[in-house]
């Protein structure tokens, strides 16, 4: 999954806390 600056994975849609 590609993690974006906002912490959201663009592909899986999982949020990184």
UniProtKB/Swiss-Prot annotation:
This is Septenin 1g. Coiled coil: none annotated. GO terms for cellular component: extracellular region. The keyword Secreted applies. It comes from Osteopilus septentrionalis. Keywords: Secreted. Expressed in skin glands. It is found in: Secreted. Belongs to the Frog skin active peptide (FSAP) family. Septenin subfamily. May act as an antimicrobial peptide. It comes from the Eukaryota.
């Amino acid at each position: 999954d590609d993690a974006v600056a906002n912490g959201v994975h663009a592909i899986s849609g999982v949020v990184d806390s």
